[in-house]
Each structure stands twice: as C-alpha cells, then as structure tokens.
C-alpha cells in the first residue's frame, strides 16, 4: 500500500518498509475484537450525531455500513489487509469504501488509543460473563457428585500421608469452595473492566464537547474513565484478569493432580471415563489421564501470560506506547486456555466413578482415627499433650504388630491409659470418626448434605441473575 493510501499517511513522504509493515501489524490477532469495535463505533457515531457533528443521514449510513461489515466478518468474507495494520483501520477503510465521505467522519473526536482500550474492555467484559457461567457449570457438577457421595469415606491427607478420614463429598465441596472464590474475584474484576476509555482520544481528551456519559450508557459501561491519560494507558484490568485466571487454573491444576493420583494403580480411588483418557503407543494396558495432565500443564502457560503482562507494563511512561499492542495475544490466549480447561473439567466430572471400597480400605491404613482417640482421652480429663503422647504410643504398638487401633485389645489400650473404656471402639471406626465432625464445615455426611443444599441455593441465585 502506498503512503497516500494509509489513513495516517499525510505527514509521511516515504512508504513503510514491507517488513516493518508486517512486523508492526496486529490484524491477524486483534480482528477478534471486530464485533466490539463495531459496537463501539456505532455508539460513538450516535453520540456525534447527537452533538450535531454528523447528520441523521450520515449516522444511518455509518450504522448500516458497520452492520453490513459485521455480517461480512461473521460470514468469513471480509477482506482483511495487513497493510491496514489493525482491526480498527481495516473496518474504517472498508466503511469508507462502502459509504463514501460519511465514513471519513466516524473518527471525529476519537483516537485508536481510546478506541482499542474500549474494544478490549468490551471484549473482556463479555468473556468474564461467559467464563463465570462456565465456573457455575463446573460447580454444579461438583455439587451433584458431592451429594451422591456424601457418605463415601476416603482418607484425608496432609503431606500426602493419611491424616484423618473424610468423605468424598466433603472433598468435592472443598473444590466447590475454591471455585466460589474464583467466581467472586472475576465478578469483582469485572467492575474495574467496566469503565469506558472512549472520549480520552489520544491522551489529552478532545476539543469537541463529547458526551461521554451518553456513550458509556449506550455501551452499558458503569461510566467514563476519570482521567484521559490513565484511560488510554491503563492495562491493570487485563493484568487483574490474568491474575484471576491464574488462580482459577492453579485450582484446576490442584484438582488435576489429585485426579491423576487417584486414577493410578497405587490409589485406585476413581475411574475416569474413556472419553477423557488416551492409551500408549507401546504399552497396551495403559489408560492415561491426559485431560487432567494437560490442564495441569496449561496452568503454567497462563501463569506465564500474567508475568508477560506485568513485564510489558512495568517500564512504560504515560501514555500509550506501541508496546501495548503486545497485550492482546497473552490476554486472548489466557481467555482461550481458561475456557478450554473449564469446559473439559465440567464435561468430565459428571462421569467420574468413585471406587468406594478402595477409598475405604485406604482410609483404614495409616491410623486415621488416632486424633479421635486423643479427643476421647481429652473428654475423659486427660490434658491434650498427654493424650497426644499416649496415642503416639498406641500407634507405635499397632505398627509393631501390624494392627489398626481398632484391632488392639482393650487390655493393651488400658495399659497406656486407665481412662479408656469399652466405648473407645465407637470412636475408632471410620464411620464414627466422620460422624463426629458434625459442626458447620465438617466432614460428617449430614454436614455435607447441608453444604450441598446451601450451594444449590447460591448456584440458583447466580444462574438466575
């Protein structure tokens, strides 16, 4: 493209170097902003007509032209040109080509600096809403599983060593709680995304009396940005979203690690559906948990995008710099990666099959009811530190003879403490242990059912909002 054909070419005498033109272009990736760019342009044009800067006929031509361009893009028929650099210039050039002189008036009172910042916020606002819906879908799957397995006993771990018995339903509700925090963070992030830069122009605002409140209302923003310099240079909202996404994926990675462990022969706690696993090219017996493994790996990718955005912004003076073009690809890939991982998990979890007998057998190993014995002694007047010492000796006694605490005869237990009576065996069963944790937030089956009921109320309210 000759320099005369560039929309900004008036000041230049020489054409842009062909390599530089390709190197600086962003249309290959920022064209995903097209629908938001068109929406922002229609709102801007509507405001210009209200001010008398466009005639009614010019506004109608611009709106119909932009809508036709949107249809072209949707149909895959739009003639994108790298020489026009980005999504904004491609759409504006096409508009002028279609409707003539009126198209040249659209950019009145506007810069690509406030235009792109507005587009990205519109895009991200939409994606946050969609991602929040995906989180609710996954949470619903977890709550369904928790309800079915409210009384299924499994070992709880600390340091990956058997610690105390819990229920599988309680474990699923722990995952649910992590995702609830993720949902709330994203909704809070959306508040700061939902601020309109349009009207800030290049950096100093516009000499036209733009009605920014009116434009913000048309675009469903909470209001216009308060400072024009900040409006065009701010990418905090993108960084904050990447941080929120990183936390979601950190949680999904933790879930994945547990699923991977639980499907192994060494645990055998669950079976994943074949549709979410693959085999080996050499080992016929293998059923590999590829989906959770890949989600665990993809979390690192999004963590990298967060640091890329932080590093991108850390040395930039006010206001806009070309560096900011590099915010799109990490942001877009963060959205895509998070969306894919949430969908995979939500599709997979309804089909997870727990192996109840394997979980129960594992919970009987590792002296999981030792704390219950200590609590029993405390209730009979033994100071906790003394009770801890006594139970430690009981565990050693069991280890030396390969017996569980529940299998040690009463006489031997009484040799460690005279307050131990025949009723001790009620607290040494796995069922008794989990049933004893009946306070709010506990692992008792009744507590899990109450947590499930509360979660369903919350999910119904959020899905209906």
From Swiss-Prot:
Catalytic activity: 2-(N(omega)-L-arginino)succinate = fumarate + L-arginine
Alphabetic keyword roster: Amino-acid biosynthesis, Arginine biosynthesis, Cytoplasm, Lyase
This protein's pathway: Amino-acid biosynthesis; L-arginine biosynthesis; L-arginine from L-ornithine and carbamoyl phosphate: step 3/3
Any single GO CC term annotated in Swiss-Prot or TrEMBL for this entry: cytosol
EC number, as in UniProt: 4.3.2.1
Pfam families with a match to the protein in the record: ASL_C2, Lyase_1
GO biological process: arginine biosynthetic process via ornithine; L-arginine biosynthetic process
Domain of life: Bacteria
Protein name as annotated: Argininosuccinate lyase
Tagged with keyword Transport: no
């Amino acid at each position: 493209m000759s320099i005369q054909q560039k929309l900004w070419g008036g000041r230049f005498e020489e054409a842009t170097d062909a390599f530089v033109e390709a190197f600086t272009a962003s249309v290959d990736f920022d064209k995903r902003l097209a629908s938001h760019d068109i929406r922002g342009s229609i709102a801007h044009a509507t405001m210009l007509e209200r001010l008398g800067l466009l005639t009614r006929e010019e506004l109608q031509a611009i709106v119909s032209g932009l809508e036709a361009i949107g249809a072209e893009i949707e149909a895959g028929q739009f003639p994108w040109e790298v020489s026009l650099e980005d999504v904004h210039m491609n759409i504006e050039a096409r508009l002028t080509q279609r409707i003539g002189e009126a198209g040249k008036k659209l950019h009145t009172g506007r810069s690509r600096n406030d235009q792109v910042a507005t587009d990205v916020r519109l895009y991200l606002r939409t994606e946050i809403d969609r991602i929040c819906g995906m989180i609710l879908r996954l949470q619903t799957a977890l709550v369904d599983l928790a309800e079915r397995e409210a009384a299924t006993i499994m070992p709880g771990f600390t340091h990956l060593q058997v610690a105390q018995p819990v229920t599988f339903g309680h474990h699923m509700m722990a995952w649910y709680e992590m995702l609830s925090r993720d949902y709330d963070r994203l909704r809070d992030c959306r508040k700061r995304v939902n601020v309109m830069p349009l009207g800030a122009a290049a950096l100093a605002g516009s000499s036209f009396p733009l009605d920014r409140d009116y434009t913000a209302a048309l675009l469903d923003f909470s209001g216009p940005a308060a400072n024009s310099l900040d409006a065009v240079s701010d990418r905090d909202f993108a960084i904050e979203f990447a941080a929120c996404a990183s936390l979601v994926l950190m949680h999904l990675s933790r879930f994945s690690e547990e699923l991977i462990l639980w499907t192994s022969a060494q645990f055998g706690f669950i079976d994943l559906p074949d549709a979410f696993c693959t085999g080996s090219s050499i080992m016929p017996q293998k059923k590999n948990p590829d989906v959770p493994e890949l989600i665990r790996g993809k979390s690192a990718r999004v963590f990298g995008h967060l640091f890329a955005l932080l590093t991108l912004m850390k040395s930039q003076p006010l206001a806009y710099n070309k560096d900011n073009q590099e915010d799109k690809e990490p942001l877009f890939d963060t959205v895509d990666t998070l969306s894919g991982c949430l969908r995979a998990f939500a599709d997979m979890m309804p089909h997870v099959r727990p192996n109840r007998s394997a979980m129960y057998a594992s919970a009987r190993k590792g002296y999981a009811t030792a704390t219950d014995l200590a609590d029993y002694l405390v209730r009979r007047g033994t100071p906790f530190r003394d009770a801890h010492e006594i139970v430690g000796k009981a565990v050693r006694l069991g280890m030396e003879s390969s017996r569980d605490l529940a299998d040690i005869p009463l006489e031997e237990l009484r040799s460690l403490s005279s307050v131990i009576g025949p009723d001790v065996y009620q607290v040494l069963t796995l069922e008794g242990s989990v049933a004893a944790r009946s306070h709010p937030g506990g692992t008792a089956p009744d507590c899990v059912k109450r947590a499930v009921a509360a979660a369903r109320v919350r999910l119904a309210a959020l899905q209906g909002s």
